Amino acid sequence: LSEWGDKLLDFYNKNPEFVKPNSRFNEVVSFVEQGLKDLSISRTSFDWGIKVPGNENHVIYVWIDALTNYLTALGYPDVKSERYLNYWPANYHIVGKDILRFHAIYWPALLMAANLPLPNQIIAHGWWTVEKEKMSKSMGNVIDPNEMISKYGLDQFRFFLLREVPFGNDGDFSISSLVSRVNSDLANSFGNLVNRVFSMTNKNLDGLIPDAEITDKEKILIETCDEKISDYMVFFKNVEISKALESVSDIISSCLLYTSDAADESCSV
């Protein structure tokens, strides 16, 4: 491994989007810049596992075994297999921040040594706590996602998880924060906008949107929405889903203000 530090740094320099978020990438680069030591890829402390060829007293280190599963599950070493050709190199590896070093340093070095293509991007996510406490079975505070979905809805639960925590950060879960986020962003904002538009359309326009000239107010609204859509696309590409959804919330707020002004003026859209 010690011989691959410069090659890794060169790869990182040429592929600045390889690890997201950037703060995690900086940690990876800093670690490699300090100099890599050789990594033992076998263990003798237990006898279960894949035996090392030529020395059956050793078994392959479980992390080396685990990483190669990305390839062997696709048919490797048959690099002409349909699965391998369809799915490798992977577009994304989505991993916890605690195993980033294995995926962003050891794994690329192994692939380089084997003359195999590297995954396109590694996304490192944070951890969840529950009301500032670590999740554990002994404490009885493990969140069952099926229970959350059953009680609050699948889309609502997904929205909360994606919106509540900035990409790459650790997040803290509580029922109160889930309810607050869903009520505020989905029911009171998005739901209110949908209800207001349909109600005004049915009441004043017989449920049909007529042809009409675009006024300066509509032009401003369209420009605002276009800007936020552009922001959304940038954030989404960078896997900053929370910020992307914040852009959607900004669009909803602008539309709510527009419909409110329209109602005050003439109850027409």
Positions of PLM-derived features:
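Structured secondary-structure scaffolds
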Residues: 1-203, 244-248
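Acidic, turn-prone loop/beta-hairpin segments
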Residues: 205-233, 260
